Amino acid sequence: MVTLSLTGLYAGLLGILYIGLAINIIRLRLRFKIGIGAGGNEFLAKAIRVHGNFAEYTPMALILLGCYELNGASAMMLHAMGGLLVLGRVLHVVGLNKTIGASKQRQIGMLSTFLVILVLAIENIRLFVLA
């Protein structure tokens, strides 16, 4: 039976982070009494973008990680890619919560996310060509 146990681990960790980001938006909406949009509030606008960025990049990375696992990737590579993805997403959140502008954590977080997506995309194509 084929399983996606390692992808499931990283999807679970990232799912918890995703819920945390959503709860942060709800908390800010309640505090500032804003139902839709950001209402001109920079804190809420930032929280919405942090959540949005996560929702934009994380699913593709997890799909590629799952494909890679199904294609027979080593546990070491799966942990390396999954761990780097989690680290990158956490750093991105920390960096954006630190400042709206550029920060080292934000830059490293996005570079890590891009690297994971690129490596997994190339590896999945490579495994297809070699099959």
Language-model features: where?
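Alpha-helical transmembrane segments
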Residues: T3-G20
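A loop-to-helix transmembrane entry motif
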Residues: L14, L44-T58
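Transmembrane alpha-helical segments that form the membrane-embedded catalytic/substrate-channel core
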Residues: G15-L30, V86-G95
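Cytosolic, membrane-interface loops and tails of multi-pass inner-membrane proteins
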Residues: I23-R49
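Core segments of transmembrane alpha-helices
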Residues: N53-L65, I117
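Short alpha-helical packing/oligomerization segments
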Residues: L64-L87
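Interfacial loop-to-transmembrane junctions
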Residues: L91-V116
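Juxtamembrane boundary at the C-terminal end of a transmembrane helix
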Residues: A121-A131
